[in-house]
């Protein structure tokens, strides 16, 4: 596809994001009166809109592998992170309300941050190190006990296509501390929605969901090693050309 057309489609998509974000943010004040699950559902219709706008405007489609591996019980999802796409898509793909761990500064983004503030997410100050981790464990326990799912990106930030970041043990520590299984997820969203790139490229994103891994009898390092091995092996299956 010619670059001018890609730019035009990406520009239209960006405008739709701005309009949808303003509309949903204003609507969020009315959603405050709803019970939490209904409020979550209403707010995450923004995510549905953006996902389908990306599909029909930019040609970004998706396919899901292993959806049947998701248990009917609280879990901690540990996912590869290449793009903003999965942070949008997972909120409405998963059958239970999602709890993201994210940097606190996102709450201060006009309109977008308003919606985040109305959800039971875990906002942390990364500079606080152990104190931030203690907050994740304490709040994560409460959210899991409420039947919600916690999602974390072990590499900590978006990674370029074909690369691998350092897997951190935070999600594994939470899993062991709460005796909650983890579910590894591989996703190749960076092919269509590269990090820090305005241009969105048409294509099909694969989300591959692995089987739950029990934390019982494992150290945090051992558990994360299992997660890392599955995710990185699966990345080479769903995006073989990137790792040639």
Where would I find each of the regions flagged by the language model?
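Non-catalytic C-terminal accessory region of glycerolipid acyltransferases
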Residues: 4, 133-244
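Generic preference for hydrophobic
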Residues: 64, 77, 100, 207-209
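Thr-Gly-centered strand-to-loop micro-motif
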Residues: 65, 101-103, 124-126, 154, ...
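Membrane-interfacial terminal anchoring regions of lipid-handling membrane enzymes
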Residues: 1-32, 45, 68-70, 222-244
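Short amphipathic alpha-helix with an adjacent loop that forms part of the alpha/beta core around
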Residues: 66-70, 139-142
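Membrane-helix interfacial anchor on the cytosolic side
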Residues: 58-60, 64
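Catalytic core of membrane glycerolipid acyltransferases/transacylases, capturing the structured
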Residues: 21, 25-48, 55-57, 69-129
